[in-house]
Amino acid sequence: MSCWTLVQQDFLEAPSVDALKTSLESKNDYVKISAMKTILRVVINGDSLPSILMHVIRFVMPSRNKELKKLLYYYWEVCPKYNNDGTMKQEMILACNSFRNDLQHPNEFIRGATLRFLCKLKEPELLDPLIPTVRQCLEHRHAYVRKNAILAVFSIYQVSNHLIPDAASLAEDFLAAESEGTCKRNALIVLFTIDPEKAKAWLLANFEQIPSLNASSLLVIIEFIRKVVLTKADGLEKLRFQSLLVSLTATNNSSVVFEAATSVINVFPDAESLKLAASRLLALADREADNNAKLIMLDRISQLAARDKSILEDLITDVIPFLSSSDFDVCEKAISIIMGLVSSRNVEDILNHFQKELTKSNGETEKDDGRRRALTKAIHSCAINFPHTAATAIQYLLSHISDFQSKSASSVLSFIKEVMEKFPDLRSSNITKLLLSLKELRAGKIFRGVIWIAGEYCLTEDDIRVAWKSIRASLGEVPILASEEQLLKDVSNVPEDDLLIDISAPASTSRKVLPDGTYATESAVTSEALSAARLEAVKASKKPPLRTQILSGDYYLAAVLASALTKLVMRFARLSFDKERLNALKAEACLIMTSIIRVGQSKFVKYTIDDDSVERIMNCIRAIYSFEELPEFQTVFLDDMRKAFSSLVAQSDKRQKEADLLVNGSDAVQADELLNIRQFQRVIEEKQDLNFESDIIQATNDGMVVEDLASKLDHIVQLAGFTDPVYCEAYVKIQQFDIILDILLVNRTDTTLQNLSVDLATLGDLKVVERPPPMNLGPHAFKSVQATVKVSSTESAVIFGNIVYGGKASDEDKIVVLNGIPVNIIDYIKPAFIPESQFRSMWTEFEWENKVDISSNEDISLYDFLHKIMKKTNMNCLTPDASLRGDCGFLSANLYACSIFGEDALMSLSVEKSVSGPISGHVRIRSKTQGIALSLGAFV
């Protein structure tokens, strides 16, 4: 199969035909080589140069220069071989004689190169005289000649089968006598293509010797078996071919094992064969060092598990070792496969393995934290889907919660919250264990989660007492300000030599007379520096963990603590009639809250408390003192907040079910849908394309949508006007990573436009990989050409260019400037969903931000405005729908999308609307690269 590259010809430096002839007549081989290269460029670009043929035969053909010989063969491929009346040129007889001499040359490499050239010839008149010599080459002593000779036989048969009618017999005899691996492979290709029946008979006759062939031959045999089993094999033959494929999965070559196992999976649907093929793929993935190869094979296992997970349930132990892979992608893929195979029979064993891997992943890197999050999510899913394992899972996570980093601990806390909500029986025992871990926690985010859980799910008097004691122990002595002042007073009694005083602080100086009568300067550390050193000593002293977080400026945690204490007091009032104990709790809660406010306004904290936190804490104090007279406070704190979280969990479950339905929806069929049974289809005729369903689905599963006529018309772009000499329009088709332009050219003049070419260029991260060839366009004629542009990222880009036509001289060329084609990045962005915690993590990580101000006079609600933004940017809203509805005057939402290149795009929308005013606000877009952030901002 020939493949050409069009090289742009520089007409300013193109020599004349006479100059080329003179160069060919030169005795210097380098001059001839340069001339031949020029001739090849000119001929490939459309000028046949018929008068140069005889000079090539006279002055180039006799040369022994290897590079010149190579260029000569290229010339024979492209040069015109027929006269205008369709008869063969007489000069080609001389060329044919030269080919025959080269086929009989004593040098085997010249023979082989000539045979390779014959594979590209398509003229039966030239091939016919060479057939006897080609047959002789099949018996040559050198394998290089033989392997090219059998391919030449194949090519000649395809050009005209009457030239070598016994090609199949030749290939069969060649196979019987041949021992070299590559020659056998080529002969198998010839036999399998020309005569499948003889090929099938050869396979069955040499059944026992096939596994001993080399890898390249086995790959050809595997491909043939797939074709013959799907089309023409009977039941007994299928069984024999199935056993052959199964035996090939036990070879030592990785490529053969992979292709054989994949063929078994695609062709033979019985459970035993599928299980065996899957086990061989897993074993192959285990011994392969390349992580990309592991991912490919695990992906095949994942596809098989999606078809029928019952087949692979027994192989789940073979997937578990991949959890220990150093590559996070391999580990994540293994987790995905395991979660697809988990059942009530093996869920406990799987949980144990997950817990072991979670214990081993104690590194501090980002990948280790990602691995912990993935394992935690898997444990979470197991516990939710199989409630009898929830107790074991949550006990393990609670006992190790202090070992997690902030990001992975958030996943653990989300899991614990969901378990508390869905499994009331597990609340009491796990609340106690969770509260006992307070003294070991260090991260403020984990503290917030634990304290929120305590305030929400301590539903008995005993649980409330345990929670109160744990919080008090983690908070330390109250009032906080008084205890810190006392500690500062105690530090004042420490000798100055034991304090770390800042020597860079301003010092007071004085002049002093020494005993010998000279003057000296005496310096003393000021009292301010001494006080600062004592204050730093107080701040650096060891304190309970919750107290440390508050003094370091985490007032969000302080507000959560105030809310939790308020809930505990109100719930105790509902459960108990002990007024004395209730009053004590109320007093202590108010003391803690007021002490937080006071210490937040003192010098003992890193940052002064903000007004929002003060207001939140003061509201909690008012609620504690007023809830008995105003029951609405209890309704808000105890009932409405719980309902809000329950609604959030229910909505999350609903969204997960919708996502699962979207993934597995292709498996659902209607009750009256026709069954496609391959055995009942009519026999496929020869030369008809084979319908390999699995291969086609795997090769073309790119989410392409078949467009109707109206949709196609929307993608037509007019590039030139009707008054231009050449009218031009293009149909823009997006196919995965390529933009395909179907360009229509119409000659509006009464003359022939010669050397017409469409020159395209790009602005942005695009590359023109296939350009339209030059052409001649007759009067009022039209022609369709195609260009392909490769897209590398989702940055804004433009395709522009012009049409050039005219004579060979540059001053005669005429140009039609084309309109630009803007590339719409929305076609490459797909809405997607990620958890809120992952969104926040990515928001912190991404460095590029594009802030766009919004001002709209449209008379629509903020909710409708959000959906308009989602439609324009093709993004998905992560904020729960219940949080967005209503008549509130402001709206804040998080949106997410992912490009087909794997780029993530995050958007935070904040808008407000007055009663009669416009919608105003801003959008913040973040991504890893600047291009996608700027491009999305242009659509807002």
UniProtKB/Swiss-Prot annotation:
InterPro entries: ARM-like (IPR011989), ARM-type_fold (IPR016024), Clathrin/coatomer_adapt-like_N (IPR002553), Coatomer_bsu_C (IPR011710), COPB1 (IPR016460), COPB1_appendage_platform_dom (IPR029446). GO terms for molecular function: structural molecule activity. The keyword Transcription does not apply. It comes from the Eukaryota. GO terms for cellular component: COPI vesicle coat; COPII-coated ER to Golgi transport vesicle; cytosol; Golgi membrane. HEAT repeats lie at residues 11-48, 90-125, 126-162, 310-347. It is found in: Cytoplasm; Golgi apparatus membrane; Cytoplasmic vesicle, COPI-coated vesicle membrane. It is a peripheral membrane protein. Keywords: Cytoplasm, Cytoplasmic vesicle, ER-Golgi transport, Golgi apparatus, Membrane, Protein transport, Repeat, Transport. One of its GO terms (biological process) is intra-Golgi vesicle-mediated transport. The keyword Protein transport applies. Gene3D superfamilies: Leucine-rich Repeat Variant. The coatomer is a cytosolic protein complex that binds to dilysine motifs and reversibly associates with Golgi non-clathrin-coated vesicles, which further mediate biosynthetic protein transport from the ER, via the Golgi up to the trans Golgi network. Coatomer complex is required for budding from Golgi membranes, and is essential for the retrograde Golgi-to-ER transport of dilysine-tagged proteins. PANTHER family: COATOMER SUBUNIT BETA (PTHR10635:SF0). Oligomeric complex that consists of at least the alpha, beta, beta', gamma, delta, epsilon and zeta subunits. This is Coatomer subunit beta. The gene is sec26.
